[in-house]
């Protein structure tokens, strides 16, 4: 099969790398890709933006692409699946209206409430004065979210009224997030542990993948600003079989039922951010209509079965008959980023390190890299994701840190505590059988 992967991040590097292992894949194109996909002889970068839908359609026709897999959320929210389907070009990813589950947090909240899916209480606002008036009656801390896509940076935990007034001014008046911030959600703050539940779904079934835990704050011990994700690991041992069953029963099944009732046409990845409270209750934080990044790197690095076969089964066959085979070891990814990320950061910095000598069971996934005059350079805030397998979480963490410390550029930083929550829970419940 001729495959086109749309996107240029670490998630898309992991997807194309995994697809290349399938017996069903022949040629794999990545649009636009990055330096990591460029140096992989099984992959070919195409200089087309992931948001240039017309050029992607033209390319898919010319190269007789058998399947297009969409990585990032923006082209999905812009209707890439609708356009490809119109031209009878097979594509893996939900239609534009269905992708509103991610592109509009208000749409998602209304959906959750309508189908009695547990989530935090909330109010929506487009007027600054009404929002601040409401905040004078609430108990802090609370959470404020911009309605539209903000690439992981449109959520803020607010500790007091002064802080909330500033954030609302930035969003609703100063338009810091553009049209994405034309409305906001003010939510009760949920407490507990946040996990990422990922599944391949269609309108007739689902295939759960590995559960993972992301680390969204830029600094150790969850300090600093919200980012797109600074690291992830899988599996997550504190998700017991009882909690897992509650996720399926209380969240996934009613979500799929609601999708059918609302005619949300969907064949793709569904990633649900879930908060598990200290009584083991589950609540939906958010829907994402694609893999998380860096969750994709940790999940796909564990996967032993044929990812492309699972996708094809979702599109053409019986998805419920599929079984995902996973390595029983831990997979842990550490994101290497450029100083000042997620604020303004420089690009074009030379990256130094021996990429040829990856440790056994370690993979360097490229997120924002570019080859300039045969020099590997940074091309964004999150640059690389060092992902390792280990018999223990400590083993996987150690391997990733060794490689992370061997790669350098001006201002490189990473979190040192990715996976520490798992270590904490395993020690706390060392006599408990998960």
UniProtKB/Swiss-Prot annotation:
The keyword Hydrolase does not apply. Residues 109-316 form the ATP-grasp domain. Its EC number is 6.3.4.13. The keyword Ligase applies. NCBIfam families: purD. This is Phosphoribosylamine--glycine ligase. Mg(2+) binds at residues 286, 288. Keywords: ATP-binding, Ligase, Magnesium, Manganese, Metal-binding, Nucleotide-binding, Purine biosynthesis. GO terms for molecular function: ATP binding; metal ion binding; phosphoribosylamine-glycine ligase activity. Binds 1 Mg(2+) or Mn(2+) ion per subunit. ATP binds at residues 135-196. Pathway: Purine metabolism; IMP biosynthesis via de novo pathway; N(1)-(5-phospho-D-ribosyl)glycinamide from 5-phospho-alpha-D-ribose 1-diphosphate: step 2/2.
């Amino acid at each position: 099969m001729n495959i086109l992967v749309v996107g240029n991040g670490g998630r898309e590097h992991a997807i194309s790398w995994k697809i290349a292992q399938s017996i069903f894949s022949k040629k794999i194109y990545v649009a636009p890709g990055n330096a990591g996909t460029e140096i992989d002889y099984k992959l070919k970068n195409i200089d087309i933006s992931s948001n240039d839908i017309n050029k992607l359609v033209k390319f898919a026709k010319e190269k007789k692409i058998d399947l297009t897999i969409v990585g990032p959320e923006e082209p999905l929210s812009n209707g890439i699946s609708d356009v490809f389907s119109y031209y009878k070009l097979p594509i893996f990813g939900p239609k534009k209206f269905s992708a509103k589950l991610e592109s509009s947090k208000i749409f998602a909240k209304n959906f959750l409430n309508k189908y009695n899916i547990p989530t935090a209480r909330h109010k929506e606002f487009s007027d600054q004065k009404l929002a601040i008036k409401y905040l004078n009656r609430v108990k802090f801390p609370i959470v404020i979210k911009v309605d539209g896509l903000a690439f992981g940076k449109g959520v803020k935990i607010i500790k007091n009224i002064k802080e909330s007034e500033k954030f609302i001014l930035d969003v609703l008046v100063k338009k810091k997030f553009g049209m994405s911030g034309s409305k906001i959600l003010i939510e009760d703050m949920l407490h507990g542990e946040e996990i990422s539940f990922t599944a391949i779904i269609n309108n007739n079934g689902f295939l759960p993948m590995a559960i993972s835990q992301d680390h969204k704050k830029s600094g150790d011990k969850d300090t600093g600003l919200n980012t797109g994700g600074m690291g992830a690991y899988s599996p997550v041992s504190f998700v017991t079989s009882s909690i897992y069953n509650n996720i399926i029963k209380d969240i996934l099944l009613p979500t799929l039922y609601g999708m059918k009732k609302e005619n949300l046409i969907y064949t793709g990845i569904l990633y649900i951010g879930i908060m598990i409270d200290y009584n083991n209750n589950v609540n939906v934080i958010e829907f994402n209509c694609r893999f998380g990044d860096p969750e994709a790197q940790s999940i796909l690095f564990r996967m032993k079965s044929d990812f492309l076969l699972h996708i094809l089964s979702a599109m053409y066959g019986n998805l419920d008959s599929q079984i995902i085979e996973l390595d029983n070891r831990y997979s842990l990814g550490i994101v290497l980023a450029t100083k000042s990320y997620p604020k303004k950061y420089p690009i074009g910095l030379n990256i130094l390190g021996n990429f040829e000598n990856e440790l056994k069971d370690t993979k360097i996934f490229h997120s924002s890299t570019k080859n300039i005059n045969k020099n590997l350079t940074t091309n964004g805030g999150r640059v690389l994701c060092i992902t390792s397998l280990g018999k223990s979480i400590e083993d996987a963490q150690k391997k990733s840190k060794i490689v992370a410390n061997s790669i350098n550029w001006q201002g490189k930083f990473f979190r040192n505590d990715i996976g520490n929550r798992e270590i904490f829970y395993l020690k706390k419940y060392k006599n408990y059988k998960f």
